[in-house]
Amino acid sequence: MKTRRRLGLALGACALSVVTAVSTLGAPATTAAAAPVTPVSTRLAVGALLYETDAFAATNLQRVARGRVPLGPGGCLHKWAVRQARKMAERQEMFHQDLARVAKDCNLSYAGENVAYGYPSGTSVVRAWMASDGHRANILNRRYRSMGIGARKADGVWYVAQVFGRKAR
């Protein structure tokens, strides 16, 4: 769908160039490259992915620096983190989700969550969490084995959810 849209935009730009060229017959020939068009939704998705990747790496750096094992990615945890970040961004408020639902859906024996808003990067949000006793305890908890991070932006403000877990045996 995105490829078709880009192709459509590119073809539209070419058609506009042809119409302009035909209407200016006799005028000196000039060409201008069309600026690439990137849909806002694509830019936001890429921005969220970069934010999430940055926060994931920063979290594991903090863990390793303190003798903890790095956490692996949790697909189910990522789904719930993204869902929570999206809800917070839509409401433009910060709140925790029901971790019992997350634990059940992801088959976890242990779960935790950090949430935040207003930090410009994944590194900065992890730095803030590390400065808070409760959030730092979640990040450094030895019971966790996997993590998911979701980030969404609303009106220029990032909303972030970090969900931790350990699979049930």
Can you name each region flagged by the protein language model?
Residues 2-14, 18-169:
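Functional surface patches built around histidine and acidic residues
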